[in-house]
């Protein structure tokens, strides 16, 4: 084996070990993002009360709990994703739909992990990358649309008269909203990493095929050519030479 070929083989083996380790980390963080997505969809802690709010309570994408404003802290909870009429704002309905779509996409991406056993690795990485990118986009839309519903009457009663679209008044952003934003960054990084891994796998496959093709061509040529220089299966045709005749 030539020194260049040996160096290429060592590089390939080193890269494959690192690629597997990075792929495992990518899969683990993809599962973490799926958990984040499920949590932010279910939990009603996107926005909530503060010390100066007229009423206690908190809101999520579709479920919310609001108190009476009296001395007691008892909350009345309403809202269900299966019954859109109980969601206080059309913006909340749209945001809930996009976050749900993001959750479905990332769960579908995890399901695609099984394709690594049957399909080309580069293809699976690229499929997952597109699904993660779409999941991030849906989560971005959900986070952007959600504040458009802050002018709903139910939220204004809890957060005060200063509350309006993209203005929370006396209320504050809670941890689920912040977690959703972190999930967006996570999904974008995972998508970029999956594209890199997929493209690198494609490049390695092409590099592996090049020497195989060269060996195949070389063996074919050597088997076709005879030791005498004749081509097997082809007769050497005599070349007609024009003889000039004397006068």
Swiss-Prot record:
Pfam families: L_HMGIC_fpl (PF10242). Keywords: Cell membrane, Cell projection, Membrane, Postsynaptic cell membrane, Synapse, Transmembrane, Transmembrane helix. It is found in: Cell projection, Dendrite; Postsynaptic cell membrane. GO terms for molecular function: GABA receptor binding. Plays a role in the regulation of inhibitory synapse formation and function by being involved in maintening gamma-aminobutyric acid receptors (GABAARs) clustering and their associated scaffold proteins at inhibitory synaptic sites. Acts in concert with NLGN2 to recruit or stabilize GABAARs. It is a multi-pass membrane protein. It comes from the Eukaryota. This is LHFPL tetraspan subfamily member 4 protein. GO terms for biological process: gamma-aminobutyric acid receptor clustering; neurotransmitter receptor localization to postsynaptic specialization membrane; regulation of inhibitory synapse assembly; sensory perception of sound. The chain crosses the membrane at residues 22-42, 97-117, 127-147, 178-198. It comes from Homo sapiens (Human). InterPro entries: LHFPL. Belongs to the LHFP family. One of its GO terms (cellular component) is postsynaptic specialization. Interacts with GABA(A) receptor subunits. Identified in a complex of 720 kDa composed of LHFPL4, NLGN2, GABRA1, GABRB2, GABRG2 and GABRB3. Interacts with GABRB3. Interacts with GABRA2. Interacts with GABRG2. Interacts with GABRA1. Interacts with NLGN2; leading to mutual regulation of protein level and synaptic clustering. Its main location: other.
């Amino acid at each position: 084996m030539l020194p260049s070929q040996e160096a290429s083989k060592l590089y390939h083996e080193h890269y494959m070990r690192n690629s597997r380790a990075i792929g495992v980390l990518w899969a683990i963080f993809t599962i973490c993002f799926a958990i984040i997505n499920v949590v932010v969809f279910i939990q009603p802690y996107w926005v909530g009360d503060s010390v100066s709010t007229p009423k206690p309570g908190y809101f999520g994408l579709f479920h919310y709990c609001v108190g009476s404003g009296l001395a007691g802290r008892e909350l009345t909870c309403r809202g269900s994703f299966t019954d859109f009429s109980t969601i206080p704002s059309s913006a909340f309905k749209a945001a809930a739909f996009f976050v749900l779509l993001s959750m479905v996409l990332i769960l579908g991406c995890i399901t695609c992990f099984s394709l690594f056993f049957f399909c080309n690795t580069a293809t699976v990485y690229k499929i997952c990358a597109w699904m993660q990118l779409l999941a991030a986009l849906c989560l971005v839309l959900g986070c952007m649309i959600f504040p458009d519903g802050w002018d709903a009457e139910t939220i204004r009663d809890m957060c005060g008269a200063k509350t309006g679209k993209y203005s929370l008044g006396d209320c504050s952003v809670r941890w689920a909203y912040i977690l959703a934003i972190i999930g967006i960054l996570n999904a974008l990084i995972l998508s970029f990493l999956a594209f890199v891994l997929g493209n690198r796998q494609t490049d390695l496959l092409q590099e592996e095929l090049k020497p195989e093709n060269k060996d195949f061509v070389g063996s074919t040529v050597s088997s076709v050519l005879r030791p005498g220089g004749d081509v097997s299966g082809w007769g050497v045709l005599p070349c007609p030479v024009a003889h000039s005749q004397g006068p």
